[in-house]
């Protein structure tokens, strides 16, 4: 997975990420709605997951990760967030569209995005597009910039975790 983030001049961050998996769209969506897969993704970043709920093709879970030093004054040593991923029904070719939302607890920040799963010649492409904003006067943009490498790392971990998961399931 390759993730690119761009911090906008007037605040907010654009997130664009692409991954490719040697699997069908149905297999990829099944993986991405499995709490055990997300547990592995977050474990790779030093975090944990809890309170996972799956309803149809939607997943909601709580994530706890070590907080970057720039935000420990706001949240302490652990950053917790509610993560929700919801998929629409499959199209004729198996493609899926969905929404992703991550809301950190204890600070006025939010990530909202769109997810696409599409078949290609050799498997399935996963595309995320979205925004991340921190609504803290005077320091919000600085916090967004500090979050950029952590967001990039989080999306990139999904590629390795996905490859491993699909090889063993």
Can you say where each PLM-predicted feature lies in the sequence?
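Generic structural detector for well-ordered beta-strands
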Residues: 18-22, 86-88, 116-118, 133
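Beta-strand/loop substructures that line and gate deep hydrophobic ligand-binding cavities in soluble
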Residues: 95-149
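Short secondary-structure junctions
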Residues: 39-45, 93-94, 107-109
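Glycine-rich portal/gate segments that line the openings of hydrophobic small-molecule binding cavities
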Residues: 51-101
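Short amphipathic beta-strand and strand-loop transition segments with alternating hydrophobic
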Residues: 46-54, 86-87, 112-119
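Short, surface-exposed coil-to-beta transition loops
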Residues: 14-16, 78-84, 97, 109-114
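Hydrophobic ligand-binding cavity/cleft-lining segments
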Residues: 3-64
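A conserved amphipathic terminal alpha-helix motif
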Residues: 84, 88-89, 140-169
């Amino acid at each position: 997975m390759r993730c690119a983030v761009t911090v906008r001049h007037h605040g907010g961050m654009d997130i664009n990420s692409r991954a490719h998996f040697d699997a069908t769209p149905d297999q990829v969506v099944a993986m991405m709605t499995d709490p055990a897969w997300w547990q592995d993704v977050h474990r790779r970043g030093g975090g944990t997951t809890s309170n996972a709920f799956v309803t149809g093709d939607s997943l909601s879970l709580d994530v706890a990760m070590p907080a970057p030093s720039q935000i420990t004054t706001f949240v302490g040593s652990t950053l917790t967030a509610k993560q929700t991923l919801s998929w629409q029904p499959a199209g004729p070719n198996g493609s899926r569209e969905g929404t992703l939302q991550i809301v950190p607890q204890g600070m006025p920040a939010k990530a909202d995005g769109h997810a696409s799963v599409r078949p290609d010649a050799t498997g399935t492409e996963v595309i995320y597009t979205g925004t991340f904003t921190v609504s803290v006067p005077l320091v919000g943009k600085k916090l967004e910039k500090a979050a950029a490498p952590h967001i990039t790392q989080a999306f990139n971990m999904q590629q390795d975790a996905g490859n491993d998961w699909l090889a063993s399931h």
